[in-house]
C-alpha cells in the first residue's frame, strides 16, 4: 500500500505533455496582380518567413502560435502573399525551465508545422496558383541557433 502511494506521488510529479487543440488563429491571402499574373510566364521566387511565439494560459496550459508568411514574386511583381497563424493549446507540466523552453520553442512548433503547411498550400491552390511544397523545418536546429544568439547577446530566454 505504501509503495502504491509513493508511486502515485511520483506520477503526480512526472513530466506531462498533452495536445489539447490545434486551430487556425489567423489567415490571409492577397493576389494583388490577379488576373493579369495568370497570363504571364510563371517564373516564381519564393520567400518564406517563419516565427513562433508562446503564451502561458491558466494553470499548466500554453498557447503556441506558428506563423508562416510566404511572398511569391513572378519576376519583379508580387504574385501573392499568404500567411497562416497555426496555433495549439498544450498542457505542459513538471518540466524544468530548460526543458519547458525547448518544448515550447521546438517540440510544439514541430507538431504545428504540418497543419500550417497544409493550410497554406490549400490557400494558395484555392487562389489558382501552383501548390507550395514547403520542405520540413528543423525546429530543433532553429531553437539551438536562437539560444546561441541569445547567449552571445547576453539575453536570458524567458517562458511567458
From Swiss-Prot:
Pfam families referenced in this protein's UniProt entry, alphabetically: SecB (PF02556)
Highest taxon listed in the record's lineage: Bacteria
GO biological process terms, semicolon-separated: protein folding; protein tetramerization; protein transport
Gene Ontology CC, one term: cytoplasm
Molecular function terms from GO: unfolded protein binding
Keywords in alphabetical order: Chaperone, Cytoplasm, Protein transport, Translocation, Transport
Keyword Phosphoprotein: no
Annotated InterPro entries: SecB, SecB-like_sf
Keyword ATP-binding: no
SUPFAM superfamilies documented for this protein: SecB-like
Location of the protein in the cell: Cytoplasm
Function comment: One of the proteins required for the normal export of preproteins out of the cell cytoplasm. It is a molecular chaperone that binds to a subset of precursor proteins, maintaining them in a translocation-competent state. It also specifically binds to its receptor SecA.
Oligomeric and partner information: Homotetramer, a dimer of dimers. One homotetramer interacts with 1 SecA dimer.
Family: Belongs to the SecB family.
Protein name: Protein-export protein SecB
Annotated organism of origin: Pseudomonas entomophila (strain L48)
UniProt lineage: Bacteria, Pseudomonadati, Pseudomonadota, Gammaproteobacteria, Pseudomonadales
Amino acid at each position: 500500500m505504501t509503495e502504491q502511494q509513493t508511486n502515485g506521488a511520483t506520477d503526480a510529479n512526472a513530466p506531462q505533455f498533452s495536445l489539447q487543440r490545434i486551430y487556425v488563429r489567423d489567415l490571409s491571402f492577397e493576389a494583388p496582380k490577379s488576373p493579369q499574373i495568370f497570363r504571364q510566364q510563371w517564373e516564381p521566387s519564393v520567400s518564406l518567413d517563419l516565427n513562433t511565439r508562446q503564451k502561458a494560459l491558466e494553470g499548466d496550459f500554453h498557447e503556441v502560435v506558428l506563423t508562416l508568411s510566404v511572398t511569391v514574386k513572378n519576376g519583379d511583381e508580387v504574385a501573392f502573399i499568404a500567411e497562416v497563424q497555426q496555433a495549439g493549446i498544450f498542457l505542459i507540466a513538471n518540466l524544468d525551465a530548460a526543458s519547458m523552453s525547448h518544448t515550447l520553442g521546438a517540440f510544439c512548433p514541430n507538431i504545428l508545422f504540418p497543419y500550417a503547411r497544409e493550410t497554406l498550400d490549400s490557400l494558395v491552390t484555392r487562389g489558382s496558383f501552383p501548390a507550395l511544397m514547403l520542405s520540413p523545418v528543423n525546429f530543433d536546429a532553429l531553437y539551438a541557433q536562437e539560444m546561441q544568439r541569445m547567449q552571445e547577446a547576453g539575453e536570458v530566454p524567458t517562458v511567458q
